[in-house]
Structure formats: structure tokens, C-alpha cells
UniProtKB/Swiss-Prot annotation:
Lineage: Eukaryota, Metazoa, Ecdysozoa, Nematoda, Chromadorea
Predominant localisation class: cytoplasm
Compositionally skewed regions (Basic and acidic residues) per UniProt: 268-283
Subunit architecture: Interacts with unc-51 (via C-terminus). Interacts with lgg-1; the interaction is direct.
InterPro entries associated with the record: ATG13, HORMA_dom_sf
Native organism: Caenorhabditis elegans
Swiss-Prot/TrEMBL GO biological process terms: autophagosome assembly; autophagy; macroautophagy; mitophagy; piecemeal microautophagy of the nucleus; protein localization to phagophore assembly site
Gene3D superfamilies: HORMA domain
Family: Belongs to the ATG13 family. Metazoan subfamily.
Name of the protein in question: Autophagy-related protein 13 homolog
Length: 443
């Protein structure tokens, strides 16, 4: 007798697990092929049906359900979840067991359980939820979630709810009953969800001032959290088995995108861009930036070019038609060079007063005493510094031999061979000039 009761409990536990697996898999929207066999050749094929169990559902049941019928009542509930956070209960499958009768003579309980399991699989595909919502699930519209708990207190199905008894099996150990409650009015109403947490010791005040304490024995067990059907579908496609969390719940692994009003993803990524660096890349340095501290005698170039427009001043232009120097000319001394630089300040004042009056090139004849003129003061601060090096350099420039005769050179009518011969004839003079220049460095 004890062995028969243990067998009854074993059959009922495996029936509960197969029923939950079959009904949840019917909500995936995929076609499932279930083949019936005349007898069970494999111990896994319970109730003459081969059902592929999903590891996620098995782990969920293992962590949440501690006792199966006939000890307790098992409830499988499906809810519709919207992106706005609203939950709408759609179905509730309740498997319960009651006391049996001793005069029951039926001994085909195992085959009756197989028939009841097939009836549940067929009924799961005939409900309004399956016809209207199962194949239309989407993350942006709605998803179907499920939860399993150990009591018969399901959520309110709203007005017009219907109840159907899928089947009832009678045995001497107990009567097994499977009931279906489903919604017909698809509108959100309050309250929709049954209490998720058990009620603690609540004190209610009566009009006469007395207090009554609610008995803990009549309180319901903790209701497990909801699990999206889409997660079970993903695990089935990938074939992976994941253990449930300590709370027995599983949330969606796919995070919804975050949208910020008035801000795009590209603007958020580029908000740290450096505007100043982009400006500096496009900025081209001016002439003053390039020439400062780039080569010696920068003040001479400063006097020849105007940094504002980069044009060459007439007063500092060197004419190629200047008269050829004679040996009788005296070399300028350092004192004369200093006087010419000091005179540049006076010339600058006169030049600013008569800035609009430009002098022709022919009227500007160079002399030994005034071979360098500054039209404006240096932008680098103060008057140009004078020294022996600058005076020696100017002497070398004056003593350099002329390579061409005075006069205009007509490049178009020039005979290249003749010009090369002239240059070759001046090679000796140029070599002597180089020796003369090198002698200063040797000293």
C-alpha cells in the first residue's frame, strides 16, 4: 500500500512537470512535433509521450516549487506585459488534488494521466491568448510572461472570465483535477495582479476598539516573479541551460535601448569634441609666426616685407641697375653703419607722414653711406641691435665681385653657350672671393 502511494506521488510529480513544460512551449509560437509511442521504451518518455524539456523551465521549477500535488496546488499563470510596465493576466492553469475514495476500483491511472496531458496540450492551442497574442509578440509592443506558484489564488481575469475543467481523474489515493481560467475581455482593469508577497500579521481595528490578528495558517505562499516567454524561446534556439536566480526569476537578457529626448546617439558620443583643436588645425600661421627666430638677421627681412599683406616695400628694394662700384670707393666703416641705423628712426617718422606718396624706383639711388634703409620700426620690440658681426657681414656683401655687366639682361635673346663661357671665365674670380671669405673665418 505504501509503495502504491509513493508511485502515485511520483506519477503526479512527473505529470505536473510535463504539463508545465508542454503548455509553456506552446506559447513560444513554434510548431512542436510530439510522437506517441505504444509503450515506453525509455524511462524519460513518461505517459507515452516524448517531450523535450527546456533547461530554463526545469531550473525555474526546481528553485521555486518545493512541493507538488497531491501535497499542494500548482498554478501556472500567463500574463501580457507591455513596454509601459502594465501587466494583463490572460490565463491560469490550476492542477489540484483532493481526497480519494476507497471504493475506487480503477487501476488505469497512468493511461488516464497520458490522456489528460494530451488534452492539456490541445487545449493550450485553443485559447484566445494563443490565437490573438502568441505569434504577435514583439519587444516594442508586448511580450507574454509566465509564473508558477504553489497555491490556487490566481489573478483576476476581469469581467467575462471563463472557467473550463480540462479533466478530472479519480483514484483511491486522490482525485486529480485540471482547471483553466482565461480572460475574454482584453482591457486593463484594477486590480489585476494577485498579491505577490504573503500578508504578515495584520491588525484590523473594529468599531468597538477591539483588535483581531489574522491567522498565519490561512496566509498564502510567496508568489514567484514573472518570466518572459521570449527568454525560454532564445534558450531553446541556442540549446543552453541556465540556472535560475535565488529569487527564482529570470529577466530578459536583451536590454531595451535608451532614448533621450532631444539628443541623438551621435551627439552624445561627440559631446567631448575639442572645438579649439579643430580651429587650430585649420589656422595657418602668419608670416610673423614663421619667421620669428627661424634664421639670423630676421630684422632685415622684417624691414623688407610688411607682415600685414606680405608685399615688398619700394624703399628697401635693391635695383639691379645700380652703378658699378669702383676701387676708388671707400669701404663703409662700422660707425657709418651705426649712423645709418640711427637715421632709420627719423626716416620712419617721415615715411608715416607721407605714406600715401610712393617714390619711384629710379629716384632711389644707392650710395655707400646709405645702402640699408628701415621703413618701419621692428615688430620684435626696440631698435635692431648692432654689432661687429653685422658690420663684417655688410663688408663682405660690398666686396663681392659682380658676375654680370650693368644693364638689362634679355633672357629671350640670350645665347646659352655664350653665357656659360662667360661664367666659366669668372670661375677664377669666384674662387678668389671664396678664399677671401674663408680667410675671415680662419682668423
Amino acid at each position: 500500500m505504501v509503495n502504491e502511494y509513493d508511485t502515485y506521488n511520483k506519477w503526479l510529480k512527473f505529470f505536473s512537470v510535463r504539463m508545465v513544460q508542454s503548455i509553456i512551449q506552446s506559447r513560444l509560437g513554434d510548431e512542436i512535433e510530439s510522437k506517441c509511442v505504444p509503450y515506453s521504451e525509455n524511462a524519460v518518455d513518461w505517459f507515452n509521450m516524448r517531450i523535450d524539456e527546456l533547461g530554463e523551465i526545469s531550473a525555474y521549477l526546481k528553485s521555486n516549487i518545493k512541493s507538488y500535488p497531491p501535497v499542494g496546488t500548482l498554478t501556472l499563470e500567463f500574463l501580457l506585459y507591455t513596454p509601459s510596465g502594465q501587466l494583463l493576466p490572460l490565463e491560469a492553469w490550476i492542477l489540484s488534488s483532493s481526497e480519494g475514495t476507497d471504493d475506487c476500483s480503477r487501476n488505469e491511472l497512468y493511461h488516464d494521466m497520458s490522456t489528460l496531458l494530451r488534452s492539456a496540450i490541445v487545449s493550450a492551442r485553443m485559447t484566445p491568448m494563443h490565437r490573438l497574442y502568441v505569434k504577435k509578440q514583439h519587444l516594442e509592443t508586448f511580450v507574454i510572461m509566465y509564473r508558477v506558484f504553489e497555491n490556487d489564488i490566481s489573478s483576476d481575469m476581469g469581467k467575462g472570465k471563463k472557467t473550463r475543467k480540462i479533466g478530472e481523474l479519480v483514484s483511491k489515493f486522490g482525485n486529480i483535477s485540471l482547471d483553466l481560467h482565461y480572460r475574454t475581455s482584453m482591457h486593463f482593469e484594477e486590480p489585476e495582479i494577485a498579491p505577490v508577497t504573503p500578508v504578515e500579521d495584520v491588525e484590523e481595528e473594529i468599531d468597538d476598539g477591539e483588535k483581531t490578528v489574522v491567522d498565519e495558517n490561512i496566509q498564502t505562499r510567496t508568489v514567484s516573479e514573472c518570466v518572459p516567454i521570449a527568454d525560454a524561446k532564445k534558450r531553446k534556439a541556442s540549446g543552453s541551460v541556465e540556472s535560475a536566480t535565488s529569487a527564482g526569476s529570470s529577466t530578459s537578457r536583451e536590454a531595451a535601448p535608451r532614448f533621450i529626448l532631444g539628443q541623438s546617439t551621435s551627439s552624445e558620443d561627440s559631446r567631448h569634441s575639442d572645438v579649439q583643436n579643430s580651429y587650430e588645425e585649420d589656422h595657418k600661421p602668419s608670416l610673423a609666426d614663421l619667421r620669428n627666430h627661424s634664421f639670423p638677421f630676421v630684422n632685415l627681412l622684417q624691414s623688407a616685407y610688411n607682415p600685414a599683406n606680405g608685399t615688398k616695400k619700394n624703399s628697401s628694394s635693391t635695383c639691379l641697375n645700380s652703378p658699378k662700384s669702383t676701387p676708388e670707393d671707400k669701404e663703409p666703416t662700422i660707425e657709418k653703419v651705426a649712423e645709418s641705423f640711427r637715421a632709420a628712426k627719423i626716416d620712419e617718422v617721415v615715411f608715416e607722414e607721407d605714406e600715401d606718396e610712393e617714390l619711384p624706383l629710379d629716384s632711389m639711388e644707392l650710395s655707400e653711406d646709405s645702402f640699408v634703409h628701415f621703413n618701419q620700426l621692428s615688430d620684435f620690440g626696440g631698435a635692431p641691435s648692432l654689432g661687429n658681426e653685422l658690420g663684417d657681414y655688410l663688408k663682405q656683401l660690398k666686396t663681392a665681385p659682380d658676375m654680370t655687366e650693368s644693364g638689362d639682361i634679355d633672357i629671350c635673346n640670350m645665347d646659352l653657350k655664350t653665357e656659360l663661357e662667360k661664367i666659366s671665365s669668372q670661375t677664377a674670380n669666384f674662387n678668389n672671393f671664396l678664399k677671401h671669405v674663408n680667410s675671415f673665418s680662419d682668423e
